[in-house]
Amino acid sequence: MPAEAMARGIARWSRRVGRGLVGSRGGASATPVVPTTELPAAGFRDAGTFAGGWSARPALGAAFRHASTAATPPVFDGATCERVDVELGTARTRTAVGFETGRVARLANGAVVASMGDTVAMCAATTARQPDPEASFFPLSVDYRERASAYGKIPATFTRREGPPKDREVLAMRVVDRALRPLFPKGFKNETSVQVVVLASDQSQDPAVLAVNGASAALAVSDIPWDGPAGAARVAVDDAGAIVANPSDADCEASRFVLTYAGTEDRTLMVEAVAMKPGGVPEATVAAALAAAHEAAREMIDPQRRLAAAAGKEKRDVCDAREETTAAAVRDAVLALARGRLDALYAEEIQSKSARGKKMADLKDAVFAELAEALATARDAEEAPPTAGPPGASVSSQTVSDAIAKVRAAAGADADDAAIRKAMKHHLDGAYLHACSRVMRDRVFATGTRVDGRGLDEIRPLAAAATVLPVTHGSSLFERGNTQTLATATIGSLNDVQRLDAPVGPDNKRLMLHYAFPSFSIDETPRRGGLSRREIGHGALAEKSLAAALPCSDAWPFAVRLNAETTESNGSSSMAAVCAGSMALMDAGVPIPEHVGAISIGLVTEEDEATGAVTRHALLADIMGLEDVLGDMDFKIAGTRSGITGIQLDCKPAGIPLAILVEALETAKRARGRVIDAMEAAIPRARRADLGEVSEHSPRFHAMDIEASLIGKLIGTGGKTIKEIQSSTGATISVDQPIVGGPVGAAGAGRVGIFAPNKKALDLAVERVGAIATPLAVGAIVEAVVIDVKPFGWILRTPGLDEGMLHVTEYHWDAARIETSDFLPLGSTVAVKVTENGPGGTKFSRKQTSEPPEGYAPPPSRTSGGGLPRPRAPLGRGAGQSAGRGLGGRAGAGGGFVRNPDGTLKRPLERVKEKSASRE
């Protein structure tokens, strides 16, 4: 049935349903039904009731939109559906946001369906009933998936199901994790899962922002201990410097800077930002964007609080009281045993990661052994452990004694030493890290020096080199302390761009940075499995930081793949990938205007125990791995000398004050300048192909205009011509559509892009395409190939694929001198002159490529009663000709045209008379 007829039928049926009648085919009777709401064009999903007993339950699509269009939420099994709706943003970007709980996923600890415009995400949070005694950190897992149906597609997989998480989904998981994790209370070790499923997308809002808000709301209404809620927002900075809150995807693509933010009422939890144009944005602009994003995120918190107040569950206890007592006692004991020796170890200012790590591991074993000995000696709370320790150790006997007494009391009077050791075991690693962190912070605040002896603003020793590998298009090695990255750049054509299948964002990307973190870089044995989420996340951050530096595709029509191999790691390996990648791009001849450097800024703080306010803080430039583990923040900042191109914030406490982040931007700017100095010393600017500076293996590109009427000739039937050129030269050729009003031809011009693996291939391809793109001029002398032999001459093809006729009379000035040896076989090449090129076709002349011989007399014209004889087919594959036959003669005659006894050519009329006489 045609689509129009089907649509008309559905419309007629809908009108009858709306009037309350559905007539039979014959029209003899009608069945009354309950009138329904008007059916939408897409189908029946919003119909309240349907003939035949459909339930009156409203469709999810209607209920998940804002309250003005949703039906009254029904009650299921005594549970009430609660919903909170708000409108956020400015007049231009105003968006309806809703949070609903109680309709779906009611068995989860907490579940919320969040909506922003027509983007809908289902978020659920669950947790284990008991804590994991083996967990050394909080076991939180986040899963984020985008259903293909959310944006009206069927998956292109073989099974037509969604496959493993895409990179975009993995990055969204990391965003949600980093926004939620800092707000879980210390000591909570129950395995917890947060799952987000995007059910619908209007393809204008980033679902990751909605996922953070929805997951926060799900935790807020659950019984899971959590110090939220948290709000998330996205802001964009346009070319005029104006900041737009909750921008659409189109707004983001046209902006200079896009920032995704999550925070609480007064602190920042997570930041991700990227510059969209070369050069980045100044620190002042980033600070303003952070402030605007914080205000936009705060607007998301109040609706969640209202929802939790209406439908939230009572929070469970963080942990058992005995566990909490044991953990605190073990921390006190380990700190008392380790403080003095850690102070002495840090004072050594060991530069090597491996040497420092070995000493810290030995110290840890010694402390644990002493604690076990103290436990074995102290049989009851009154018995004190030995106070003697190794030389240099400072041990508080009373603290250790009190700690063991608390552990014994928490374990119970009947607990033996084995039970007590088991109770303490799960807290030892955390207690030792706490001691290391406490001593490190005291050293920073007291002396202004760090574990390896550096000052707070001092960065580790730098080393940089370019062109470290042969054959590759570009390569570099960047080293900062014990962090080292080897990068390679490979340039490809625009056919090599990565196609993206995402509801929002660009359709493809020209720069692909693949970050690798092998186990040997941290002296560990290999792990099983594919890419980790960490590798995907670090690679994406480095890629976004460098992507803005690439010229536009019109100025530099290439795709680039960067491989960043982490060969050593002691912190900030993703920032080393940015630095090494920038150098590799310049080494490959990618015309980026300036280097992109990167640095990580750490933080140590002291807080007021009563209020939680930060009383002291210190920023650490270029943090190493130990400072990342023991500190409070990892603030990764990439950019040029003039601005910031990429940002990512991870934090451990329940957020960082915004003022500290703004201060960190200036610290990073100073440190980044020193990093770029080292990079410029290795390679100050991008290498230039026109100066012969790039590798001989580097690809080349050339663009030329082509007349619109010649595009078909270049492509050929079924692409035959362009494929043959690509096959013979090794180049890749792309043809853009004609530009109306272009400089070539009245009908406009097309653009031909030629990408070749090296200069030789490029020159050959340019010559071939140039011959086709240049119209054949009358009077030009060209080399042509014989492609067919006719009775009257030869069909030739020029390098520009123009075909024309070389008549036999145009072969030689003196037709009488045409000999058998002069015949042109198929495939032979001949130099000819273009005598005609127009609507009537193209004609060539061989004889006009040279001057006529002395004494040459042109043959009489046909108008004077003469005329040239009609020649027969030359040797070759002419119709009806056999091998060995001469031009115009019999087989074996060895002559040219038919002649009189005196050698003159017989005229056609004379030959006809002779043949007639012979027949008589």
Language-model-detected regions and their locations in the chain:
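Long, basic N-terminal domains or extensions that often function
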Residues: 70-319
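Long, charged amphipathic helices and adjacent flexible linkers at domain junctions
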Residues: 311, 318-322, 674-705, 763-783
